[in-house]
Swiss-Prot record:
One of the proteins required for the normal export of preproteins out of the cell cytoplasm. It is a molecular chaperone that binds to a subset of precursor proteins, maintaining them in a translocation-competent state. It also specifically binds to its receptor SecA. It comes from Bordetella pertussis (strain Tohama I / ATCC BAA-589 / NCTC 13251). The lineage of its organism: Bacteria, Pseudomonadati, Pseudomonadota, Betaproteobacteria, Burkholderiales. Its main location: cytoplasm. The gene is secB. One of its GO terms (molecular function) is unfolded protein binding. GO terms for biological process: protein folding; protein tetramerization; protein transport. This is Protein-export protein SecB. Residues 153-163 have a biased composition (Polar residues).
């Protein structure tokens, strides 16, 4: 009976697990370089948004995933405000097959973090007394696939049959 319990525990320890351990605001900055003059502007602002996903391994099964957004709003070529924020999370990924790690870190983790980042950015902008800006939903799977396509285009060696798996930096050549 004790042997069966030990076998069940060992089998359970080999089971794949994906756990969110912590979500935190890693960085948030807001600049209004042309205040208070921008409050007098009557024209509609132009909004530029860029999003980036990153991450790093913290321990064997522990990873930090980040989503960074930069929002630049201009009126008549003057910056109304600039908001930069990074939302981060610590995730434990144990016994996950290698081919599933990158999609989990590049799609699932950012998808979980993004709502927190949206709320933090919206709150920061609201505190400027300007109209709120609510960031649109992001399809992180499409961004991930786009990144893979860009990497494939930068990898002419892979298309020529060199499947070493080594990703070269731009401009580097294989010896």
């Amino acid at each position: 009976m004790a042997d069966q319990d030990q076998t069940n525990q060992q089998a359970g320890s080999d089971a794949p697990s994906f756990n969110l351990q912590r979500v935190y605001l890693k960085d948030l900055s807001l600049e209004m370089p042309n205040a208070p003059h921008v409050f007098l502007e009557q024209e509609a602002p132009q909004v530029e948004v860029s999003i980036n996903v990153g991450g790093q391994r913290l321990a064997e099964t522990v990873f930090e995933s980040t989503v960074t957004v930069t929002v630049t709003t201009r009126v008549n070529d003057k910056v109304l405000y600039l908001v930069e924020g990074t939302q981060a999370g610590i995730f434990e990924l144990a016994n996950i097959p290698a081919e599933q790690m990158d999609p989990l870190l590049g799609i699932v983790c950012p998808t979980m973090l993004y709502p927190y980042l949206r709320a933090n950015v919206a709150d920061a902008i609201t505190r400027t007394s300007l109209p709120a800006l609510h960031l649109a939903e992001v399809n992180f799977q499409a961004l991930y696939e786009q990144r893979l396509a860009e990497m494939a285009q930068q990898q002419p060696d892979a298309a020529n049959g060199n499947d070493s798996g080594i990703i070269l930096p731009p401009g580097a050549t294989r010896q």
